[in-house]
């Protein structure tokens, strides 16, 4: 594993990254903006991590088949189900907000939804690495499976009488 940092850049955020990488004994290389641009097609904010294993990138993604086995073995309490999110910025923002709200997992349909891509990861600001994401073929069948696994399915709407913050969301809950 290596971290490439923009040479000559002096800001608190990059300094903290360099300190953490040093403590973790990760190689740190100062490089030019052109080298960073080359590695990222221009989207880097002055730092790039090169990981030796795709397992790190994919550890929070799972298939539909793995979903219910995972639920049997883990205490996932709050799931967010998103349908029709096609803009990667919107999915990234949803992931970031979900992470802050304590959501353990996000479920999206495979079709007509954006997948987890570099733009989503960037906008999610780390949430893509902490919130599990599952792409399913059939949302209705998935909801039925969640019910059979003891989840309460809670529908949300923009014009609901009560805010989501006024609801009792303890226990196994899936927000749609």
Feature roles, as predicted:
Residues 1-175:
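Post-transcriptional modification and biogenesis factors for structured RNAs
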């Amino acid at each position: 594993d290596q971290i490439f940092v923009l040479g000559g850049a002096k800001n608190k955020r990059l300094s903290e990254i360099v300190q953490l990488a040093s403590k973790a004994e990760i190689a740190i290389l100062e490089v030019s903006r052109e080298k960073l641009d080359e590695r990222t097609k221009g989207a880097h904010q002055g730092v790039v991590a090169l990981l030796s294993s795709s397992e790190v990138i994919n550890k929070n993604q799972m298939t539909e088949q793995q979903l219910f086995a995972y639920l049997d073995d883990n205490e996932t309490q709050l799931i967010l189900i998103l349908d029709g999110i096609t803009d990667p910025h919107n999915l990234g923002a949803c992931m970031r907000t979900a992470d802050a709200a304590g959501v353990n997992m996000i479920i999206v349909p495979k079709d007509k939804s954006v997948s987890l891509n570099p733009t989503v990861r960037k906008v999610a600001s780390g949430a893509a690495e902490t919130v599990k994401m599952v792409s399913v073929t059939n949302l209705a069948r998935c909801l039925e499976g969640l019910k059979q696994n003891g989840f309460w399915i809670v529908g949300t709407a923009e014009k609901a009488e009560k805010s989501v913050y006024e609801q009792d969301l303890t226990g196994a809950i899936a927000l749609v």
